[in-house]
Regions:
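Short beta-strand elements
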Residues: 147-163
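Nucleotide-binding motor/catalytic cores of P-loop/tubulin-like NTPases across gene-expression machines
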Residues: 151, 167-172
């Protein structure tokens, strides 16, 4: 229902509800001083996204969730359920240690040549027809190859490939990554 999440958050904030169950959305931008316990289920799910920033996003989300507990007079507690308790982003988030996370993440980024140690651009192509998308993708790939040969030999091309969600609302999608 329209505005239902605002009503639920308001009821929780006003003390009309003692337990709030929600998605990632509730950890951002809300201040509930009486919250003393935060539980995060399947905290490692975002680690498996096909995105080089997956560990960073997991770390951020867990730190934001942990920041919801103990904001008022009473101390807070955070319980994290995970299938990857040895993952560096989970460990660093459990300590809320940004330096610990960065030290591990920057090693990974350097090894893989990902930002901030390299430049990276994603080119998302979308068309209503699958055959049109294939033709457009081939044209873009040829253009990229031509530019690479003429000016940017150090350019590394990944793809084209299907993105994690390759069709949305009858729109077909392809993605190409460029690294330098």
């Amino acid at each position: 229902r329209k505005n239902s999440h605002e009503q639920i958050l308001s009821a929780f904030s006003d003390g009309e509800a003692d337990i709030l169950v929600g998605t990632q959305m509730i950890v951002k931008g809300h201040d509930f001083p009486d919250v003393t316990l935060v539980g995060v289920l399947a905290a490692d799910m975002s680690l498996y996204a096909s995105d080089y920033t997956a560990a960073e996003k997991t770390f951020q989300l867990l730190c934001q969730a942990a920041g919801r507990a103990g904001r008022g007079k009473n101390p807070g507690e955070v319980v994290i359920q995970t299938y990857a308790p040895d993952n560096y982003s989970i460990i660093a988030a459990s300590h809320q240690d940004y330096d610990e996370f960065f030290e591990q993440e920057i090693v990974y980024r350097k090894l893989m040549g990902y930002p901030p140690v390299a430049n990276m651009v994603s080119v998302l192509l979308q068309c209503s027809g699958e055959s049109e998308l294939e033709m457009a993708t081939e044209s873009v790939v040829q253009l990229i190859r031509k530019v690479k040969e003429q000016k940017y030999n150090e350019l590394f091309v990944i793809g084209p490939a299907d993105p994690p969600v390759s069709k949305i609302n009858d729109i077909y999608r392809k993605i190409i990554y460029l690294k330098s």
